[in-house]
């Protein structure tokens, strides 16, 4: 659909569609440790979904589409959560820097993301075009229902 952007579609459906596109393309470089790692220190278990790396990459690409100039540190803030401390009060805890760095490096390998001269990463014109195309597909699929 012409004129449909990432902001116009449901974010969950978009991330699911983009993750499926990344997996189907087969070009995203996935580290070998993805099945054994936790996503943050406040998590108790590794993710149940075996395709979590594609979902995280899709979510990161969507975030960079909405707010460019985000780096590894800001991604750890976005994917942080509540650290439970037993009988002590809970506090905020950041996500894994290694996972955030590897996701951004994988997206750079696809030429969807590039380093920004002001710091952080930003979407390339090709990456923005891919995301808008997938948003159009999601909007067209929703229109049929």
From Swiss-Prot:
SUPFAM superfamilies: Winged helix' DNA-binding domain. Changing residue 47 to L: In DBA1; affects assembly into a functional ribosomal subunit. Changing residue 62 to Q: In DBA1; affects assembly into a functional ribosomal subunit. SMART domains: Ribosomal_S19e. Keywords: Acetylation, Cytoplasm, Diamond-Blackfan anemia, Disease variant, Host-virus interaction, Methylation, Nucleus, Ribonucleoprotein, Ribosomal protein. One of its GO terms (biological process) is positive regulation of respiratory burst involved in inflammatory response. The modification N6-acetyllysine is found at residues 23, 111, 115. One of its GO terms (cellular component) is cytosol. Changing residue 127 to E: In DBA1; affects protein stability; does not localize to the nucleolus; affects assembly into a functional ribosomal subunit. One of its GO terms (molecular function) is protein kinase binding. Its main location: cytoplasm. The keyword Secreted does not apply. Higher level expression is seen in the colon carcinoma tissue than normal colon tissue. It is found in: Cytoplasm; Nucleus, Nucleolus. The modification Omega-N-methylarginine is found at residue 67. Component of the small ribosomal subunit. Part of the small subunit (SSU) processome, composed of more than 70 proteins and the RNA chaperone small nucleolar RNA (snoRNA) U3. Interacts with RPS19BP1; the interaction is direct and mediates the integration of RPS19 in state post-A1. Interacts with RPS19BP1. Belongs to the eukaryotic ribosomal protein eS19 family. Component of the small ribosomal subunit. The ribosome is a large ribonucleoprotein complex responsible for the synthesis of proteins in the cell. Required for pre-rRNA processing and maturation of 40S ribosomal subunits. Part of the small subunit (SSU) processome, first precursor of the small eukaryotic ribosomal subunit. It is linked to Diamond-Blackfan anemia 1: A form of Diamond-Blackfan anemia, a congenital non-regenerative hypoplastic anemia that usually presents early in infancy. Diamond-Blackfan anemia is characterized by a moderate to severe macrocytic anemia, erythroblastopenia, and an increased risk of developing leukemia. 30 to 40% of Diamond-Blackfan anemia patients present with short stature and congenital anomalies, the most frequent being craniofacial (Pierre-Robin syndrome and cleft palate), thumb and urogenital anomalies. This is Small ribosomal subunit protein eS19. The lineage of its organism: Eukaryota, Metazoa, Chordata, Craniata, Vertebrata. The gene is RPS19.
